[in-house]
């Protein structure tokens, strides 16, 4: 009986550990009854409350720089070039219905680029502000990482628009 109790407690602890990760559910056009593309995103971690951020659309002067802060800690990471035009974003979706969610899979701490400027949260919101399609968001994200470095540990991004869904 004692062994069963210990085994049960171990499974319970393993389940609790897994529940601290974010959860994404993605459905492509061919898998939904009405042809909709669906992305659901849940930040299952404690302390990640249901905040709904708004980034208004805008036109920016050539040469404008944008400050980047780590999404989790608020630490200043550096500056990037601002796009000439940015799009309206509410939560994790922009005015063109481009949607981005993420799931952290971590990784080895010694592999994190502490000199990088783009963390996972900044990648999401900057890409949403600069993209009209999911493919364009992927291009924006990969270009930003190539130019400015990636500050976070491992992430899986679910990126969708009304026509397709991708995992990056």
Feature names for model-found ranges:
Residues 22-120, 140-168:
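A contiguous strand-loop segment
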Residues 16-21:
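Sec/Tat signal peptide C-region and signal peptidase I cleavage site
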Residues 1-2:
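N-terminal secretory signal peptides that target proteins for export/translocation
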Residues 5-14:
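Sec-dependent N-terminal signal peptides
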């Amino acid at each position: 009986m004692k062994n069963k109790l210990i085994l049960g407690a171990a499974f319970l602890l393993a389940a609790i550990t897994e529940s601290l990760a974010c959860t994404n559910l993605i459905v492509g056009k061919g898998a939904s009854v009405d042809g909709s593309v669906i992305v659901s995103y849940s930040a299952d971690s404690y302390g990640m409350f249901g905040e709904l951020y708004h980034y208004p659309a805008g036109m920016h002067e050539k040469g404008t720089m944008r400050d980047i802060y780590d999404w989790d800690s608020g630490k200043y990471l550096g500056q990037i070039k601002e796009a000439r035009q940015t799009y309206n974003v509410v939560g994790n979706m922009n005015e063109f219905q481009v949607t981005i969610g993420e799931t952290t899979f971590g990784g080895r701490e010694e592999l994190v680029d502490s000199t990088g400027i783009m963390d996972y949260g900044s990648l999401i919101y900057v890409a949403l502000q600069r993209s009209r399609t999911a493919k364009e968001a992927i291009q924006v994200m990969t270009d930003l990482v190539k130019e400015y470095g990636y500050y976070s540990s491992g992430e899986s991004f679910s990126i969708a628009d009304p026509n397709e869904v991708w995992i990056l």
